[in-house]
Amino acid sequence: MGDIEKLTRETIASGGILAMLYFDIHAKTKELVQELGTGFINEIIHKQGVVFALGEIDEPTGGAEDKNWSSSIQLKVLAKDFAVLGAICMANSPYSVEILRPDEIKLTLANAHSLLGTMSATTAEYKRYILTKLSNKEELGRLQENLKRRADMGKDILKKDK
């Protein structure tokens, strides 16, 4: 058994997930598609909780008549747990995900909390971005009031827990 297979088995035995993620990528030039794809793969490789990742960029196509170049990226990722894989998917939006191993996923309560927290934070960030881009000054004021009220409620809850 090779080192990678041994690492994969050990990681999966302790809650890890081996998955294939598929992404599309577009840019003005063929070279830029390749550079962006390489940078993207490198970014995933260095994310906390990624045990290893191996990516492949398909040959870019297109570019005719002022059209962008396009390619696909296949990225095999060994994540230390399901929450890490979930966070990668939420942050990077693959167009498809295939879990290769294990055949069944069991979440610890801590892992479920981590995943739900990441989902909530990601959704809140998207909502904030969209609302600040589309809202007028009056709507932004109401949004800021709501955020302050939520923060105050959070402070009250934290005080009760102490």
Predicted segments with their positions:
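Long, contiguous binding/interaction regions
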Residues: 1-162
